[in-house]
Regions:
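Conserved ABC ATPase "signature" region
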Residues: 39-57
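Conserved ABC ATPase signature
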Residues: 61-65, 69
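Hydrophobic anchor residue at the start of the ABC signature
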Residues: 75
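Catalytic Walker B motif of ABC-type/P-loop ATPase nucleotide-binding domains
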Residues: 86-89
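Short loop immediately C-terminal to the Walker-B catalytic DE motif
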Residues: 92-93
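H-loop/switch region of ABC-family ATPase nucleotide-binding domains
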Residues: 118-119
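A short, surface-exposed alpha-helical micro-motif characterized by mixed small hydrophobic
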Residues: 124-126
């Protein structure tokens, strides 16, 4: 699989994505599963947790995290694998304004290509360079943004 590890998928519900007992073990799982050695995976996990502002929670059990923290840990798990493309399913759904802003800022800073499925106008406005509006599976509108991401 030549594209293995190149595309990161963020699920709408982070509970469907998080599998490690602790935050660090969860974020290390992806790189280890790609065949990275333990030292490289640990370093990548620490870097990714630092990127999302949760390095201080690395030893916390995943089940003790808030919904926003779980979403950030799931995103860190993707970033640790150094993907070139992110597929994001409702990345800001059910988050408070501060966590939504953090997610958007992290995604902007990543400079990665993204395909985003969302109902959040703020997410579209801040992240999309091109948007396609679907209604019952049919394209009803398309637009390109004037800002650079």
């Amino acid at each position: 699989a030549p594209h293995r590890g190149k595309v990161g998928l963020l699920f709408q519900d982070p509970d469907d994505q998080l599998i490690g007992p602790t935050v660090l073990e969860d974020v290390e799982f992806g790189p280890l599963n790609l065949g990275w050695d333990a030292h490289r995976a640990h370093h990548a996990a620490d870097d990714a947790l630092d990127q999302v502002g949760l390095l201080h929670l690395s030893e916390r059990p995943v089940h003790e995290l808030s919904g926003g923290e779980k979403r950030l840990v799931a995103l860190a798990g993707l970033l640790a694998m150094k993907p070139t493309v992110l597929l994001l399913d409702e990345p800001t759904v059910s988050l408070d304004n501060d966590t939504t802003e953090r997610i958007i800022e992290i995604l902007l800073a990543s400079k990665l290509s993204m395909l985003i499925a969302t109902h959040d106008p703020l997410c579209i406005d801040r992240l999309a360079t091109r948007s396609v509006l679907l209604d019952r599976g049919a394209i009803t509108d398309q637009s390109e943004s004037v800002h650079q991401v």
